[in-house]
Amino acid sequence: WFTHPGIQDFATGMDKSSNFGTLDIIEALHWVKKNIRSFGGNPENITIFGESAGGHNVLTLLASPASNGLFHKAISQSGYTSSFTTIEAIGVDSNGKTINSLGSDSILNEYNASSYQNIKNAYLENPKKNADQYQKYLRSIDGKELFETYKLIADKTFHRIPLATRDGVVIPLQGIQASL
């Protein structure tokens, strides 16, 4: 949310991420969980809700391991997600270090590790020269198998609590696969 090279030089631990807004919300949820009984609430039945940017915050909390156990249901109204550059979507930097654990790198490694590793390494070695080859490889993947692989990874990551986010139009009630 707020990052500046000057902050990064002195930041440690979680502050190094510069996700101060998300970290503040997580701290607030710790407080809620600790104190909710004083207000007649149940610390084992906490629902979070957000609209627009708040909906985005809900989705961010769902993706953050630091928020595990702090809430039990989530509602994201008009929340949004961000798109990634090609490098971010692949999920690794030029040194092969993971920068996006749910990027296409994780999914494609699950899908077909050996052939994907070869094409990914060629792309990372020279993105301009090998972009067409990488894109051709991605277009050759069977969509059904790829979505099944994505679903396996997503089930491990995101389906830990009930989430209200669909409207039946933007995301069909049958899920994203039904729209393809």
Locate predicted features.
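Non-catalytic cap/lid and distal C-terminal segments of serine-dependent acyl enzymes
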Residues: W1, A63, T86-I87
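Cap/lid segment of the alpha/beta-hydrolase catalytic domain
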Residues: W1-I26, K34-S38
